[in-house]
Amino acid sequence: MGKFTVLNHPLIQHKLTIIRKKDTGTNEFRQIVGEIGGLMVYEMTRDLPLKNVEIETPIGKSTQKELAGKKLVIVPILRAGLGMVDGVLQMIPSAKVGHIGMYRDEETLKPHEYFFKMPPDIEERECIIVDPMLATGGSANMAIGALKKRGAKNIRLAVLVAAPEGVKAVQEANPDVDIYAAEEDEKLMDNGYIYPGLGDAGDRLFGTK
């Protein structure tokens, strides 16, 4: 089964508290979501492989390290996942960005895919799905399934807050996918919101209702 990791770095926890507050405005919310995304991917990528390369500094020749192995693609689940992308790209500017568009039926809470766009070599890349919320796990599982259907083999999931029910759903449906969260919250409410959560991340990012 894939591992579930809470990235409890003090800066991540501090910034998460700010965006949880109901009086945090759109601009600050948007900025900090991006910052947390960058901090999370920094922690998540500690196991990326390195290789030796010969370079020449202004002083002379030297053997140094650079990234090896599979290239990365960041996959936000639209629309809320977009808020995490800029922070991730500040850490990994060379990463490609794919997009999966989904909406959730407010009655059934079931996700529906309406858009999918990826780099052509998706099967050769490591995919990091980003989405602020892991609630029921429905959207995450659909996104993972859509990537696997197109040939992706290496997938990780990064979320800001996760409900235990969502973590369980993803682990059962996709035991080969590792999940990373800034925090695991208490529970999933009957209306599909995470408690205590941070509200509707998409609306708070873009100033909509």
Curated annotation (Swiss-Prot):
Signal peptide: none
NCBIfam families per record: PRK00129.1, upp
Organism from which the protein derives: Lactobacillus gasseri (strain ATCC 33323 / DSM 20243 / BCRC 14619 / CIP 102991 / JCM 1131 / KCTC 3163 / NCIMB 11718 / NCTC 13722 / AM63)
Keywords of the record: Allosteric enzyme, Glycosyltransferase, GTP-binding, Magnesium, Nucleotide-binding, Transferase
Metabolic or biological pathway, per its Swiss-Prot or TrEMBL entry: Pyrimidine metabolism; UMP biosynthesis via salvage pathway; UMP from uracil: step 1/1
Binding positions for 5-phospho-alpha-D-ribose 1-diphosphate per the UniProt entry: R79, R104, D131, P132, M133, L134, A135, T136, G137, G138, S139, D200
Xref: InterPro entries: PRibTrfase_dom, PRTase-like, Upp_B, UPRTase/APRTase, Ura_phspho_trans
Free-text activity regulation comment from the record: Allosterically activated by GTP.
An example Gene Ontology biological process: UMP salvage
Positions that bind uracil: I194, G199, D200, A201
Coiled coil: none
Cofactor info, note text: Binds 1 Mg(2+) ion per subunit. The magnesium is bound as Mg-PRPP.
Family to which the UniProt record says this protein belongs: Belongs to the UPRTase family.
GO molecular function: GTP binding; magnesium ion binding; uracil phosphoribosyltransferase activity
Top EC category: transferase
Cofactor(s) the record lists: Mg(2+)
EC number, UniProt record: 2.4.2.9
UniProt function note: Catalyzes the conversion of uracil and 5-phospho-alpha-D-ribose 1-diphosphate (PRPP) to UMP and diphosphate.
Protein name: Uracil phosphoribosyltransferase
Catalytic activity: UMP + diphosphate = 5-phospho-alpha-D-ribose 1-diphosphate + uracil
